Amino acid sequence: MDTIIHNSTRNNTPPHINDTCNMTGPLFAIRTTEAVLNTFIIFVGGPLNAIVLITQLLTNRVLGYSTPTIYMTNLYSTNFLTLTVLPFIVLSNQWLLPAGVASCKFLSVIYYSSCTVGFATVALIAADRYRVLHKRTYARQSYRSTYMILLLTWLAGLIFSVPAAVYTTVVMHHDANDTNNTNGHATCVLYFVAEEVHTVLLSWKVLLTMVWGAAPVIMMTWFYAFFYSTVQRTSQKQRSRTLTFVSVLLISFVALQTPYVSLMIFNSYATTAWPMQCEHLTLRRTIGTLARVVPHLHCLINPILYALLGHDFLQRMRQCFRGQLLDRRAFLRSQQNQRATAETNLAAGNNSQSVATSLDTNSKNYNQHAKRSVSFNFPSGTWKGGQKTASNDTSTKIPHRLSQSHHNLSGV
């Protein structure tokens, strides 16, 4: 939403503003670009999040829930909710959607709470991967605690959106020559009077910078840095696959968040340092317009990074399109039959290889007229003297937890 700073006093009636500050060429170009980008995000990201969310819900219903899949489902839900209210905000910013005060406040609550929970969920996913790898023994977190964390996250998101709802209202815009305020258009905006700029507005911008910008970057970088260092100690095959995934995930997030945090910090500075003149008010609107696009871009790339990059999730999506995930019993029966067939083929292949090896060994023994003893070679770190060595404990636990982390990061 646009943020309007008006050099007047606050009253209970809808404010009327005569736009004496003409829109500059750069501001018009940036606002037009914002509208085009938001339209693209709505028409591409909306269906994409809907498909991913439906696939994840059906997969959870068929295969069961886990802590990562619960977080993934919440992430797709918040992104879809944000993109659901975004068209109304875009139309309002373009002066194409008249609305009342109550509907504007409702849209503000949904928008700011869903964006807040979306950023928090991304940080929670990173924290959960750190928890899995950091613990010596992998202990699954109970579903009750997971749901409690998400409940508290949504509660915090709603509390965070309260200031936005309080200061969201309908503003009637009029031309500078319309002294009687007869012709105009209404928009949903965050409305602040001049005396609230250095107190309420500054506090809101600083809070937004911390919650939407700095905190997710710090948590993602910290937790995935530990994840990255742990992956390097595993086997080469597991390392190359997971390192690529984590690198793409982290680089994409930081590439979007770094300019966003910089813009928000500069916007907070401009709020307090710049005077209330047309030139500076226009620059503030330009900076705010640039910063507004970043949360919407996250809603577009999150399903791509967390779902579509995973081979397992793509397989589930194909099964969803074929209708295989609609019947849980039929799907589980089909999976069981496939596993049984695979095990039968594997056993048959092993038996054939064993017979061939036995015949070849007997032939060599017959030709060489020599007896060969059978030795049982234990791999390093196996049972010795009735006890298992520590090297096996280290070599099995970390790859096992890493495998769980990689599949859980893929959203399945």
Curated annotation (Swiss-Prot):
Q: Which domain of life is it from?
A: Viruses
- The record places the following residue ranges in the Intravirion compartment, namely 55-70, 130-138, 225-240, 306-412
Q: Where is the composition biased (Polar residues)?
A: 388-397
Against PROSITE patterns, the record matches this protein to:
G_PROTEIN_RECEP_F1_1, G_PROTEIN_RECEP_F1_2
Q: Which InterPro entries match?
A: CCR1-9-like (IPR050119), GPCR_Rhodpsn (IPR000276), GPCR_Rhodpsn_7TM (IPR017452)
Membrane topology qualifier: Multi-pass membrane protein
Gene Ontology molecular function, alphabetical: G protein-coupled receptor activity
A GO CC annotation recorded here is: virion component
Q: Which CDD domains does UniProt cross-reference here?
A: 7tm_classA_rhodopsin-like
What keywords are annotated for this sequence in UniProt? Disulfide bond, G-protein coupled receptor, Glycoprotein, Host cell membrane, Host cytoplasm, Host membrane, Host-virus interaction, Inhibition of host chemokines by virus, Membrane, Receptor, Transducer, Transmembrane, Transmembrane helix, Viral immunoevasion, Virion
Q: Where in the cell is it found?
A: Virion; Host cell membrane; Host cytoplasm
List the Virion surface topological domains. Answer: 1-29, 96-102, 161-203, 268-281
**Where do transmembrane segments lie in this chain?**
30-54, 71-95, 103-129, 139-160, 204-224, 241-267, 282-305
Family matches, as Pfam families: 7tm_1
- Asked if the Swiss-Prot or TrEMBL record annotates the protein with the keyword Cytoplasm, the reply is no
Keyword Transcription appears in the UniProt entry? no
Annotated disulfide bonds: 104-188
The record describes its quaternary structure and partners as: Heterodimerizes with US28.
The record's similarity note reads:
Belongs to the G-protein coupled receptor 1 family.
Q: Tell me, in a sentence or two, what this protein's role is.
A: G-protein-coupled receptor (vGPCR) that constitutively activates multiple oncogenic signaling pathways including STAT3, AP-1, phospholipase C, NF-kappa-B or cAMP-responsive element (CRE) pathways. Plays an important role in viral reactivation from latency through activation of host CREB1, facilitating its recruitment to the viral major immediate early (MIE) genes. In turn, expression of the MIE-driven genes such as UL123 are de-repressed. Also facilitates virus dissemination via the extracellular and cell-to-cell route.
Q: Quote the PANTHER family the UniProt record gives.
A: CELL ADHESION MOLECULE, G-PROTEIN COUPLED RECEPTORS FAMILY 1 PROFILE DOMAIN-CONTAINING PROTEIN
- Protein name as annotated: G-protein coupled receptor homolog UL33
